[in-house]
Design a protein with these regions (language model features):
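A broad, low-specificity signal for short, low-complexity segments enriched in glycine/proline
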Residues: 69, 105-110
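Short Cys/His-centered divalent metal-binding micro-motifs
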Residues: 146-155
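N-terminal accessory alpha/beta regions
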Residues: 1-94
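Cys/His-rich metal-chelating microdomains
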Residues: 109-112, 152-153
Length: 155
């Protein structure tokens, strides 16, 4: 994977985090995973978590919930909510982030051109997650967990 160098990356991350936090509404307090993420932990810290600390967030979550039942309604509702929030963010916020990054080539293959949006400012870009959003839904919105890439990587 090619290294992405951008002198404004921390400011871009802050802007992204601020935009995501504004969208945080209608949280179900009766879901223990959402309650942990939004009330016990600082959600902003997870969204803006630097790459070197993502594994620490995973360890914290696993320590808080050592015996997750991945078939239980609580977990399924949490996963559905977080992936839904990611899709909303992808459609509404990520265009500006991509525009700020000035990234034109897939960081995986360094050959395919990647585009942020179509003419209607709708995000057409593909994103991969370093830590899978299906296994780690609490990292689905983490700025440094998102990898802007070409469609070949996704498929």
């Amino acid at each position: 994977m090619i290294e992405i160098k951008n002198s404004n990356i921390q400011q871009i991350s802050r802007n992204y985090t601020d935009s995501v936090i504004i969208m945080k509404r209608n949280i179900k307090r009766n879901n223990k995973y959402l309650a942990y993420l939004f009330y016990k932990r600082k959600f902003e810290d997870i969204v803006s978590c630097p790459p070197s600390s993502l594994i620490i967030e995973i360890e914290r979550f696993n320590k808080q919930f050592p015996d997750i039942d991945y078939e239980a309604r609580d977990w399924c509702d949490f996963k559905k909510y977080m992936i839904g929030q990611y899709e909303k963010v992808r459609k509404e916020i990520l265009y500006d982030v991509l525009d700020s990054l000035n990234l034109n080539v897939c960081p995986y293959c360094n050959r395919q051109y990647i585009f942020g949006a179509d003419n209607n400012r709708k995000v057409a870009a593909q994103f991969d997650h370093f830590y899978s959003k299906s296994k780690y839904p609490y990292l689905a919105l983490s700025f440094y967990n998102l990898i802007h890439c070409c469609p070949k990587k996704i498929s």
